[in-house]
Amino acid sequence: ELAKLHAKPSALLFSSAYVANEWTLIALSKIIPNIVFLSDSKNHASLIQGILHSNAPKMIWTHNDMSDLEEKLKKAASLNLVPCIVFESVYSMDGDVSPILSVCDLADKYGAMTYIDEVHAVGLYGTTGAGYLEMLGIQDRVDIVNGTLGKAFGVQGGYIAGDGMVIDAIRSVASGFIFTTSMSPVICSGALASIKYLKDHPELREQQQLQVKKLKHKLNKVGVEVHPSACTHIVPVMVRNAERAKRMSDELLNEYGIYIQAINHPTVAHGEERLRIAPTPFHTDAMISDLVEALEKVFKNVD
């Protein structure tokens, strides 16, 4: 079902998307001689750890900077290394999106492999909920897709999808897949039901995007700063002070019954602290109005 969702020949389940990322990258370093990982500077910790633990050479390219990525690809070619571009579709802290088409064009130009993390996109984008690649109509242009069953699908676990031979090779050498307990039939059944349900209910994705637009509009109207790069369902409200962000989060919960997680260093840089909001299709207009009103008061009351 996951392979079908991503229009790939094969898929492989892991205990989490973190484990899937980490051990797939480690496995690729064992399978492909002379591989070099070209990693976006804002990649998730699981991707970073996978690259570090692989002991393969790496090059870090400036976030979403295609000129820098191309320079790294040229360098990899000059060293006779096999490049694997590692990036995400939706970045969870800023709520921005990678220039996926441009990345794929560069990959084609330099013969690079592509590995994309769609954790914050699966279930939420695309005709059937397969993510940003499906929404752009380019599922065939990325080699390996990583996704999660624990966010939009609301269950547990992670996976990769890709070419059958590549997935079989990863299955054979990824210790994080081989030497751990498999997902239980109950969890698999729940995930399968959720995947099928979201495939058949695109109106939920449409409703979520509508509620996100309403929230951003209302926040802008009252002068609450949203990260300027945010263009997805992730709405980062900028606070820029760790202690204040924590106090604001506490007051929202204690005084208004609204839980919003404060995001501090090392997840984001010092001075970039924020409250991260992700509206769902089931957050009503009244709930959004209450949230904005509460945020406006908390920004005034909490120093």
Segments and roles (model prediction):
Residues L2-W23:
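Short loop-beta-helix segment that forms the pyridoxal 5′-phosphate
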Residues K4, N254-E255, T267-D303:
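PLP-dependent enzyme catalytic core of the Aspartate aminotransferase-like
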Residues S16, L38-S54:
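Substrate-binding/gating loop at the entrance of the active-site cleft, primarily
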Residues T24-A45:
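Conserved PLP-anchoring active-site segment centered on the Schiff-base-forming lysine
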Residues M59, H63-I116:
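Active-site phosphate-binding strand-loop segment of PLP-dependent enzymes
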Residues Y110-M113, H120, Y125-C231:
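Active-site C-terminal subdomain of aminotransferase-like
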Residues R205-K216, N220-G257, H265, G271-E272, ...:
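Conserved PLP-binding catalytic core of the aspartate aminotransferase-like
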